Amino acid sequence: MGRKKIQITRIMDERNRQVTFTKRKFGLMKKAYELSVLCDCEIALIIFNSTNKLFQYASTDMDKVLLKYTEYNEPHESRTNSDIVEALNKKENKGCESPDPDSSYALTPRTEEKYKKINEEFDNMIKSHKIPAVPPPNFEMPVSIPVSSHNSLVYSNPVSSLGNPNFLPLAHPSLQRNSMSPGVTHRPPSAGNTGGLMGGDLTSGAGTSAGNGYGNPRNSPGLLVSPGNLNKNMQAKSPPPMNLGMNNRKPDLRVLIPPGSKNTMPSVSQRINNSQSAQSLATPVVSVATPTLPGQGMGGYPSAISTTYGTEYSLSSADLSSLSGFNTASALHLGSVTGWQQQHLHNMPPSALSQLGACTSTHLSQSSNLSLPSTQSLNIKSEPVSPPRDRTTTPSRYPQHTRHEAGRSPVDSLSSCSSSYDGSDREDHRNEFHSPIGLTRPSPDERESPSVKRMRLSEGWAT
């Protein structure tokens, strides 16, 4: 820190004035010496103080310098105090550096402009490297759903599987379907039955069991996992999909997994909202869990909920109308059904509702193309027909296929319309066909056998 700058005026205190004179006089002589040596010049300094004392300084000899001075005619430069003051004022007005060392920290216009430029460059860098708020998902989230308790669903998402997101974990062994035994004929799924939604083996090896799972609806929306013998590898970024339908539309299917408790099932209006909100992603929703009406449970059929539900399920035409067509927990939710169409489904009779289901499934099979990664082989095996006695031993495995004795119920009509084939193609392709949904039809004699229907009604669905 430099010395404090003092005002150049006469010092009133005698003592201070004497001290200042002594110091500055020596300083002046020192400067004269430096100037004479550095610049090779002759200097003569004559000082009279306030008490008329003489102080002189000469670089060589005072008499010699004074003689030279008297012989000189006209000085080249002659200055007085007024000239020095004027020169100092001009320097300050030009913005030259002040003797005060603190003035170097002053904010000059040039420095302020420099700081402004630095701030602008920093702001531009922040804007250009801004991180996006919602990065697009690039991986599948595996979900394992044990069914030991019907009050809650435990979703286990292992973090380590994010590095290799190609597996859908298998669910509880109670979800295994007894489709390996000869003779169990796959029935066509009804509005809430997903047992035949993907029956068969979708990989080169024979899978033993699979649980309900869901994949990312954006990357690999084409496959849904159902309780069948399948083992599916869903890849993070699928290769170009293989179109399996009539039109080359974008395959948009995703999985809707219902809550575990039957007391917390979403209402019909919530399901309508879910179906309509799914249209923003253009993804018709296909649920893969067993349906459960509020206050009612299903027994015997493997599902993501519990297999310990009671078997007091009974489905009437009024209950079917309350389902709003396909709006059950595992029904086929069509994203194209709007709110007013859902409202009309409430008021339609069962016969008209069954016709609507048949028309809607035909549209679904032709327009909503299920896409599979082209690296996977489609090999769906059909199984031999079982004797009718096997059907009576497990009546509750196909709960929504019960029929009234007078004729087929609307649920059966809905189940028959869930197939991707219509007309005689269903019967012709019963033994060997390659379908992305893997549906098989029962034989006509089994469908029309009243004894089998009565036994199922008496054993599995007695209230």
UniProtKB/Swiss-Prot annotation:
Q: Which residues bind DNA?
A: 58-86
Q: Region Disordered: start and end of each range?
A: 178-223, 365-463
Modified positions (N6-acetyllysine) are K4, K114, K117, K232, K237, K250, K262
Record-marked site positions (Cleavage):
D422, G423
- GO CC term (a single one): cytoplasm
Per the record, the covalent cross-link Glycyl lysine isopeptide (Lys-Gly) (interchain with G-Cter in SUMO) lies at: K381
Sites where Phosphothreonine occurs are at T283, T290
Q: Which residues form the MADS-box domain?
A: 3-57
- Coiled-coil stretches are none
Q: Which residues carry this modification: Phosphoserine?
A: S59, S98, S104, S220, S226, S238, S386, S409, S435
UniProt feature, compositional bias: Polar residues: 365-380
Entries under PROSITE patterns matching the protein? MADS_BOX_1 (PS00350), MADS_BOX_2 (PS50066)
**Composition bias, Basic and acidic residues:** 423-433
What PTMs does it carry? Phosphorylated on Ser-59; which enhances DNA binding activity. Phosphorylated on Ser-386; which is required for Lys-381 sumoylation and inhibits transcriptional activity. Acetylated by p300 on several sites in diffentiating myocytes. Acetylation on Lys-4 increases DNA binding and transactivation.
Q: Name one GO molecular function term.
A: DNA-binding transcription activator activity, RNA polymerase II-specific
Q: Which domain of life is it from?
A: Eukaryota
Q: Say what the protein does.
A: Transcription activator which binds specifically to the MEF2 element present in the regulatory regions of many muscle-specific genes. Controls cardiac morphogenesis and myogenesis, and is also involved in vascular development. Enhances transcriptional activation mediated by SOX18. Plays an essential role in hippocampal-dependent learning and memory by suppressing the number of excitatory synapses and thus regulating basal and evoked synaptic transmission. Crucial for normal neuronal development, distribution, and electrical activity in the neocortex.
Q: How are the domains described in the entry?
A: The beta domain is required for enhancement of transcriptional activity.
Q: What is this protein called?
A: Myocyte-specific enhancer factor 2C
Organism, scientific name: Sus scrofa
Instruction: Tell me what gene encodes this.
Output: MEF2C
